[in-house]
Structures are given as structure tokens and as C-alpha cells.
């Protein structure tokens, strides 16, 4: 199943304007973004209306409808302590948290996750972290994460809360994710 730009606009009413505001998507159009989403979706098994609905709900919330593909916060909270270590960053105050803050449509966070994605994609996103915020990197890394966490399975059984926890590490923004999901279900199913 392929999605259309009309469906994306019905699910994320601000997507077109937000793409223009996203500094990493400079010059991109909604047509081009739609084409990229469709280009990579099959590779990652996002091929049914239900899977698309769940995937789009998560990325709509995480990116504020494509407005941001880089975490707004500085990333300092990932720089020291147990959280830094869990994410593969060094526990020293050396800037790893800021360097490996969340990027992509689903905010890939931490040196460990960047290194794992690098193994898959072949681009050195550990050294060139900004690649994860640019269109291809933002889209592919979110779909890679989706497959890595087996989120298609949870989409198939309509487990929005579980998908949210696995995408976000908690239930942050659950009501908004549900709103996007319900809208996507109406549009796609």
C-alpha cells in the first residue's frame, strides 16, 4: 500500500507548512516527502493501512508533523550518568549527549543507536550526526527503528500504548498519538 499526499494532509494538517519550516528539509515538497515515505516503507514492512496508521501516528507526534527532525532540547540530559551509559554515550561530561541527541522522525537517541543504524545504512551517522535529521536519514532511520523494535507486529494487533512505550520509552504524548492514530485509521482503513 502506498500513501498519498492528500492522506498525509488529512492526518497531519500542518505537514506541508512544517516541511517548509524544517531547516533540514530545505527545498523539499510534500510530493517529494510522500515519494520518500513510499520508497522505503515496503523495505521495512509498513505495507498495510493499520501499519501505516500506527507509524504515521508516532512520527506525527515525534516530529510535530515534520516540523522537527532534531530534538529541540540540547541533549544535555544524555551527557552524564546512567542514562548516558544506557544510550551508549560516555558517562563523562564531554558533549556526547548533545552530539547524539534525538534525530529523525522517531528520535533516534544515543551513540549506541546511531552506531547500530550506521551498521544498517552504511553512512557514518556517528561522525555526521546531521544526516539523521535530513529527509532520507530521518525517514529511513525511523522505519529502521520501527522494524528493529518489531512495531509492525504491535501495529497488527492494534497495540498503540505498547508502540508508544517502545517508540518513546514511556507514554509521553499518548493522547496526541492516539488522536493522530484515530485520524489515520479513518483516512486509511
Annotate each predicted stretch with a short phrase.
Residues 2-32, 36, 55-145:
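Peptidoglycan-targeting cell-wall enzymes and recognition modules
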Residues 36-42:
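Amphipathic, Lys/Arg- and hydrophobic-enriched alpha-helical face
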Residues 42-47, 127-133, 155:
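Short, mixed-charge amphipathic alpha-helical segments
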Residues 45-55, 68-72, 152-163:
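Surface-exposed patches in mature extracellular/periplasmic domains of secreted proteins
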Residues 59-62, 155-173:
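Acidic helix/loop microenvironments that form the catalytic cleft of cell-wall polysaccharide enzymes
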Residues 137-139, 148-155:
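Proteins synthesized as precursors that undergo proteolytic processing into mature forms
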Residues 172-189:
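Extracellular low-complexity, O-glycosylation-prone Ser/Thr/Pro/Gly-rich "stalks"
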Amino acid at each position: 500500500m502506498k500513501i498519498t499526499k492528500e492522506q498525509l494532509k488529512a492526518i497531519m494538517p500542518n505537514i506541508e507548512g512544517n516541511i517548509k519550516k524544517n531547516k533540514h528539509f530545505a527545498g523539499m515538497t510534500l510530493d517529494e516527502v510522500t515519494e520518500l515515505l513510499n520508497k522505503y516503507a515496503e523495505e521495512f514492512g509498513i505495507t498495510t493501512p493499520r501499519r501505516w496508521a500506527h507509524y504515521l501516528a508516532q512520527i506525527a507526534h515525534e516530529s510535530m508533523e515534520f516540523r522537527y527532525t532534531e530534538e529541540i532540547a540540547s541533549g544535555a540530559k544524555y551527557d552524564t550518568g546512567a542514562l548516558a551509559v544506557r544510550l551508549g554515550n560516555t558517562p563523562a561530561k564531554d558533549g556526547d549527549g548533545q552530539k547524539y541527541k534525538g534525530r529523525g522522525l522517531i528520535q533516534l537517541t544515543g551513540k549506541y543507536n546511531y552506531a547500530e543504524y550506521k551498521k544498517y545504512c552504511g553512512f557514518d551517522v556517528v561522525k555526521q550526526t546531521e544526516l539523521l535529521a535530513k529527509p532520507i536519514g530521518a525517514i529511513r532511520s525511523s522505519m529502521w527503528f520501527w522494524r528493529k523494535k518489531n512495531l509492525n507486529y504491535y501495529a497488527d494487533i492494534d497495540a498503540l500504548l505498547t508502540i508508544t512505550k517502545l517508540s518513546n520509552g514511556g507514554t509521553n504524548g499518548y493522547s496526541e498519538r492516539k488522536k493522530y492514530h484515530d485520524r489515520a485509521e479513518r483516512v486509511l482503513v
